Amino acid sequence: MKGKILFALFLSAGVIACQPASQAAKQQEVKVAKAETKTKKKESKAEKFRKALAAQDKWQKACSNPVQIAPEGVDVAQFIKEMKATIKYPEDGNVVGDWRKGESLALLKKEYKALYGKKGGSKKGNCYACHCGDPRIIACGNIGPSLRGYGNKGIDPKMTYERIYNPWSQVPCSTMFRFGYHGLLTPEEIADIVAYLHDPESPINK
């Protein structure tokens, strides 16, 4: 009997001693699984972006000649008509959303942090890679036209929306990303960026 009690005590001690190691192993497994999931999500987003830009539909093929101004062998009026037909609008029909959300989409995380000292920003728009806009952001691109004071130029917000959704609906073979056409931005996100460009309270127009 005494031997059985001692055996039970030793067994209990062994189980207790093993628990922390077992829990640590499980925690490590959870961490690894989370890290792998995060990596897969990043890869899937990057892959989606690469596929979108490399998609060779008939229009992309027509614009693949780097020295041409208009699509080769295509009626320009028909080209623009078909590009306009691809444009989808927000469910509520409003092409002007929330400029603050638009600003967060337009700025990279590091740009947002530098301006406001808190988390925000996104890789989705990255507008300042090609444009200047907010005068506080000095490191900006010049591939596209300046966006400073954009809301004071009398441009129809719907035209701005369409230009972002599918630039080829206005300028065939434009080098600007077709954000909506390729699904890089949702209609609602594009509406928020339109607000960022047009709203009088936006830093773009200050």
Curated annotation (Swiss-Prot):
The keyword Transport applies. The keyword tRNA-binding does not apply. PROSITE patterns: CYTC, PROKAR_LIPOPROTEIN. Residues 1-17 form the signal peptide. InterPro entries: Cyt_c-like_dom, Cyt_c-like_dom_sf, Thiosulf_SoxX, Thiosulf_SoxX_II. A lipid is attached at residue 18 (S-diacylglycerol cysteine). This is Uncharacterized lipoprotein aq_1806. It comes from Aquifex aeolicus (strain VF5).
